[in-house]
Amino acid sequence: MHIAVVSLGAFGHVNPTLELVTELVRRGVRVTYFCTEGFRTIVEPTGAQFVAVPSWMEAHAGESGEDKSDVAATVPFLFLHEAEAYLEPVLAVLKEDRPDA
């Protein structure tokens, strides 16, 4: 069995998956884990195959010059941009190595 995990590059998104991924790998499941490069050293010890994806948020950090006082209102839009940045690289890998889940 092959499972693909796609995670936003944030500790609150990655950390909860690590124990599950470790257990899946221990049970012989092949796991491909997509996340931003900064999480490679955290994900690789699980035994999953790590695939780095680009981060729109990292690439555009500090560009807008806008008032950051109402950041909560913009978070959903940031996540949409981040998901869009992931889409092509994730689909390219999965097209060649289709997961079961």
Regions found by a protein language model. Name each.
Residues 1-101:
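Glycosyltransferase specificity loop/lid
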